[in-house]
Amino acid sequence: MSASAVNVTPGRNVVVVGTQWGDEGKGKIVDWLTDHAQGVVRFQGGHNAGHTLIIGGKKTILRLIPSGIMREGVACYIGNGVVLSPEALFKEIGELEEAGLSVRERLFISEATTLILPYHIAIDQAREARRGAGKIGTTGRGIGPAYEDKVGRRALRVQDLFDARTFADRLRENLDFHNFVLTQYLGGAAVDFQATLDTMLGYADRLKPMVTDVSRRLYEENHAGRNLLFEGAQGTLLDIDHGTYPFVTSSNCVAGAAAAGAGVGPQKLDYILGITKAYCTRVGSGPFPSELYDADNPSRQDQIGITLANVGKEFGSVTGRPRRTGWLDAAALRRSIQINGVSGLCMTKLDVLDGLDEVKLCVGYKIDGEDVDLLPRGAAEVARCEPVYETFGGWKESTVGIDSWDALPANARAYLTRVQEVAGVPIDMVSTGPDRDETILLRHPFKV
């Protein structure tokens, strides 16, 4: 009997997105919310960004598998919007299984998910090397070239692995194209056909038990009354369409991508939680109006920025690269809120601001003397933005582990209240430390 026949109330779907340039602390919040979800869904990106979880003092970094895998009994889904490296997937599965977690029986992969192949990685790395000083900061893991193949309708997908002859024919055709680019344009070495074929087909039997029609399964789960959590990677300002182009990632990181990248109707997305760090960070190249510190730029060595980097442990969880740091940019945050239709914010890493004499909030910009209240769309224009700040008194008290609003220092509350006012949406959660218990809940995304 169908769910509708027995009049089951559909479950609630919550989307978690980063509102900055990634690294906002989404992993911890997804893990916290998973207490109230029966499934967690990845809908875009690949293994180029990591989610760091601290549970019981133990650090775990997940790059591809949804954070819900840390909770027994929670189903995890990799949607069609993801680009999948089987090598990275099975490495991560192995690490989790060594830690005693059950993975394969709870992980479901869309048959329409695009595969990352060795030639994607070779092209990614050769292209970035060729750019020299003009590099865009790719992780070199083949994400961008895999998405290029998807848009160019050349991509090999997970379901193609189960027809060896057709897979071989299409692989040979793809290699003819990509090896020409590698050798004749990028000056790299050709990728071997047989070695690639053997490697990829070797994953087929291991993948097959986890492959399913994810779109249908999510529909059925929702209509059976189960809550689903959609876990975004990277951040809105890295979105291929809405970010500081061309210094962006290769996928859509915004809330709307949850519908397309998992195969669910957009009206089924009930609540959008925007994750916002209490300050800003950025990895790699690209404009950053409120920047204070960049390890690679001698002109960006502000001591407060260095403090934020050190106290916040701002190093990429996958690449290890130091992150650039700066004050929270509310004008950029407003842009993200509008694009995503954010229902409420979760402010993370508030504790990193503890001990500062003053805290600044970028509320807009000056461009050629003109006032601008929203982050511009193009990188060239963003680079011309001069930040306009409001200044708040700092707080000397520690906020680490505080789990109620009233227990926060008065100046911390004043800062957060002003962020809400400028952003135009409520702060529904505040993170005061890396552990899942170090959280202030003001409104519950699954219960609003």
Swiss-Prot record:
The gene is purA. Keywords: Cytoplasm, GTP-binding, Ligase, Magnesium, Metal-binding, Nucleotide-binding, Purine biosynthesis. The lineage of its organism: Bacteria, Pseudomonadati, Pseudomonadota, Betaproteobacteria, Burkholderiales. Its EC number is 6.3.4.4. This is Adenylosuccinate synthetase. It comes from Burkholderia mallei (strain ATCC 23344). Plays an important role in the de novo pathway of purine nucleotide biosynthesis. Catalyzes the first committed step in the biosynthesis of AMP from IMP. IMP binds at residues 23-26, 48-51, 139, 153, 234, 249, 321. It is an enzyme of class 6 (ligase). GO terms for molecular function: adenylosuccinate synthase activity; GTP binding; magnesium ion binding. Mg(2+) binds at residues 23, 50. The active site is at residues 23, 51. HAMAP family: Adenylosucc_synth. Substrate binds at residues 317-323. PROSITE patterns: ADENYLOSUCCIN_SYN_1, ADENYLOSUCCIN_SYN_2. One of its GO terms (biological process) is IMP metabolic process.
